[in-house]
Each structure stands twice: as C-alpha cells, then as structure tokens.
UniProtKB/Swiss-Prot annotation:
The keyword ATP-binding does not apply. This is RNA/RNP complex-1-interacting phosphatase. Residues 1-12 have a biased composition (Basic residues). The lineage of its organism: Eukaryota, Metazoa, Chordata, Craniata, Vertebrata. It comes from Homo sapiens. Keywords: Hydrolase, Nucleus, Protein phosphatase, RNA-binding. Monomer. May interact with SFRS7 and SFRS9/SRP30C.
Amino acid sequence: MSQWHHPRSGWGRRRDFSGRSSAKKKGGNHIPERWKDYLPVGQRMPGTRFIAFKVPLQKSFEKKLAPEECFSPLDLFNKIREQNEELGLIIDLTYTQRYYKPEDLPETVPYLKIFTVGHQVPDDETIFKFKHAVNGFLKENKDNDKLIGVHCTHGLNRTGYLICRYLIDVEGVRPDDAIELFNRCRGHCLERQNYIEDLQNGPIRKNWNSSVPRSSDFEDSAHLMQPVHNKPVKQGPRYNLHQIQGHSAPRHFHTQTQSLQQSVRKFSENPHVYQRHHLPPPGPPGEDYSHRRYSWNVKPNASRAAQDRRRWYPYNYSRLSYPACWEWTQ
C-alpha cells in the first residue's frame, strides 16, 4: 500500500498505489529500538539524487529524548540545508504512521508512503513502486538538482536495499559498488544479510509491471525504461539511454550509465571523502561503531584482527576491500 501526499500541486499529486489494506499500527510514543544509534542524515550519494536518513520523530517524542538526540521533520530540513542541498521528494518506507505526519512537512515537498515490511526482502511490487516514484521524480525534475530523501526506521536496511536495487537494476551499477557507495554515504553499513545477499546474487528485477494497465492512473510506465540521467544540471548533458518507442518493454533492463559508474568508483576510492563531512567510514564486521567518538568500540568476543584495528584515524584510513560488512547480522 502506498499513499501520496501533496496538498497543493506537483508531479505526484494524482498517483495512488493500491496494495495492502492497512499499515501495522502501534500505540504510544516509544522511541524506535536502536534509533539513537544511527546518524540522523547521511550524505548525498554522488552521481545520484539520493540521500538517506532515519525517520524523523514528531514533537510528542521529544520528552523522551535528550536535546541533542532530537531529530524532527524541521531538523531534517535544517540538516539537509547545512549540506547545501534541497529535498524535492520524501519516500517513507516505514510500516507505521505513528512517527510523524505528512502535515509536519513543508507543503512544497511531495511525500510518498510505501508501506514496506521490515526484515524481509521487499517484494517485486514494492520495488516497482519505488522505481516508478524515482523515475517519475527525475523526469519532472530534469532542470533542477533537488534530492530524493529516503528513510525507513533507521534509514539503513530497507532504505539501503531499495536505493541499491534501483542503482543495480536501472542504472546498471555493480552490486558491490552500489552497496559500498550507500554504506559510505550513510555512515553505517547495511546490516541484514538477506538484503545484502539478494543485492549481490539475486535476480535483476524487471523495470515494468505487467499487472498495472497502461491506461490507469499509474500513468504510462514506459518512462521507467528511460531513466533520466541524474547528474547535477550544470555538469553536462543528460542522456536518454534507452529508446523504446515502438518496441515492447524488455523483461530486464540495464543502463550502462558511464558517468554514474565513474562517480561511484571515484567516490569509493577516495580515502579522504569523510574528512569534508566529519564522518568516519562504516565499521568492519564484528565491531560496534560509535559515531560520537569516531572510533571502533570492539566487542569483547571480537576476533584478534578486529582488536588490532581498534580505532579509526582520518589521516591514515585506507579503503577496506569490499565486502567489509557482509557478516553483520541482527
């Protein structure tokens, strides 16, 4: 089940996805488990329009948080502005509506709710909805550089999976590169092994949905096969990489977006990328990352190798050979 919210105007106003009958409802204003352990907002993923963040919490949660722990919808926009970026769409993947209301967001920013069950790999319908929303946004925002903000509860597992799934399926990015780019920009590694394994070894998901009539209010899905190059406007032309007019849509689609591939690899190989934003790289397996101290807090039962690399130092950090975080499990 998905819900669009845009009270005035915008490219997403008329869309309404159908699916699950209702979201899972939970009472109370208890803080989500482990929510405090994660950075509020990551960095923009270079070569893309994506930025990931944990769910902001409405004002009623603040009495249970220290002032420095609060992260409200207003705080979200302030932190995005501090990075000299602007949000143009928020995609909410949480499976509840208790954390904040669309009305808490600026009226000028479209909001899309895609109810996504946690812990399990999203189904093909959810993946397609996400791809359709992203491509619709890119199509309508070719002439600006606004970002797509994506969040689940922690802005990590469901968020990372769907962003990486898009990069792999639509942009043709290698799974390892997509996962590493997300990990570095989010400041935390994807944790769920089933998500990582599906991204690494699972099938490419089709970029169209045969169950949705082409004449429906879902609009013409053919533009999913024509991903808009999402490079910043002033950095060169956009390329319409796959013309399909007059042809049937292929079952699977890869785009070899060379500039995006180069951006991913260049970013991943830059050992100083975190110094600009004061974020350490994601933690190696078997270690408990504490972003407040910019160091690795080694678990008592960690391996000898983990104990040997106890702290992170920004000036001698060398890129970990991927996969650095594959053995993290819940």
